A protein has these predicted regions:
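Conserved hydrolase catalytic core segment
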Residues: 114-149
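Hydrophobic, aromatic-rich cap/lid helix
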Residues: 185-212, 227-229
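Active-site loop/oxyanion-hole signature of alpha/beta-hydrolase fold enzymes
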Residues: 74-114
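Conserved loop-alpha-helix segment in the C-terminal half of the alpha/beta-hydrolase fold
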Residues: 224-258
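Conserved HGGG/HGGXW glycine-rich cap/lid loop of the alpha/beta-hydrolase fold
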Residues: 41-85
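Catalytic histidine-centered segment of alpha/beta-hydrolase-like enzymes
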Residues: 258-266
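Flexible "cap/lid" loop of the alpha/beta hydrolase fold
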Residues: 138-167
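N-terminal twin-arginine translocation
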Residues: 3-13, 17-31
Length: 281
């Protein structure tokens, strides 16, 4: 994959640059207390859990809420992202504890195996929930089973580097300033805690769900972004096919030209794909 394609998918620059706040919808807070997530509920109908990605808030799904009004959406907001205080996410591992907390919410709200849709890091969380048998079906948006693969690495190879990078970003004054500047300059990431972002990046670089895909019982659909360059789009498609081969029956859909935030760059096509996916619940 060319440098442009790799840069587009960088977990830090791509995830942060795509963390758009598209306005604040009207919603009702769910009666659920958590030090790791907040949940808001919008609409009535069959249950769908929406999980945003790195440094993003639930505003990334505003277009979905408007386009698909016949579902009850449970919007996850990870603490430490997009203006929400970090609380228990302020230090230590993030991804698995957040997945556990979303699973706790599903049980507390008495949701019967809802559809779960996750973008970027949210896609990783969606797959982790699927491995807990908490989902009836799963849509992953522009994420590979191994977070490190999004930048051309592996969990074993990039994991060590991510540990070092995480230590630099959170343990040194220069690193904290650098990450804070990136957050401040990125639309939608403002209000995100740099240390929470660094911890999330470290977790993602060390997670590889590829070997566990055969255990994923729920139907899986993966929507991924491709650019206008045909050769790069072909390389991206080949990578997604190879990396999701462990889950038989996975439906892969390319949407482009698009950057990482498919729902913002191609809203009509994304909402149509999501609408078709949700017909299965």
């Amino acid at each position: 994959m060319g440098n442009e394609g790799m840069n587009r998918r960088a977990l830090l620059s791509g995830g942060l640059a795509g963390a758009l706040t598209l306005g604040a919808p009207l919603w009702a807070a769910a009666p659920f207390a958590s030090r790791r997530i907040a949940v808001n509920v919008r609409g009535t109908g069959r249950d769908v859990v929406l999980i945003p990605g790195l440094a993003s808030g639930p505003g990334i799904w505003n277009g979905v809420l408007a386009a698909l009004p016949t579902y009850r959406f449970h919007l996850i907001h990870v603490r430490g992202f997009a203006g929400l205080s970090a609380d228990a996410n302020a230090s230590g591992p993030l991804v698995q504890p957040v997945a556990d907390e979303i699973a706790r919410y599903v049980g507390a709200a008495k949701l019967s195996r809802p559809a779960i849709v996750g973008h970027s890091m949210g896609g990783t969380l969606a797959m982790l929930l699927g491995l807990k048998a908490a989902a009836s079906r799963i849509m992953v948006v522009d994420m590979l089973p191994a977070g490190a693969a999004m930048v051309g690495g592996t969990a074993s190879g990039l994991g060590f580097l991510a540990d070092q990078l995480g230590g630099y970003l959170t343990g040194t004054l220069a690193g904290r300033r650098y990450l804070a500047q990136m957050v401040a300059q990125t639309p939608g990431a403002k209000g995100s805690d740099p240390e929470v972002i660094a911890n999330a990046l470290r977790d993602l670089a060390n997670i590889d769900l590829g070997p566990q895909l055969p255990r994923l019982a729920a139907p899986l659909e993966v929507v991924y972004a491709v650019g206008a360059d045909a050769a790069q789009a072909s390389a991206i498609t080949s990578r997604f096919r190879a990396d999701y081969a462990g889950k038989k029956g996975t439906l892969l859909k390319a949407i482009g030209p698009s950057g990482h935030m498919v729902m913002a760059d191609q809203p009509t096509r994304f909402n149509a794909a999501l609408g078709d996916f949700l017909k299965g619940i």
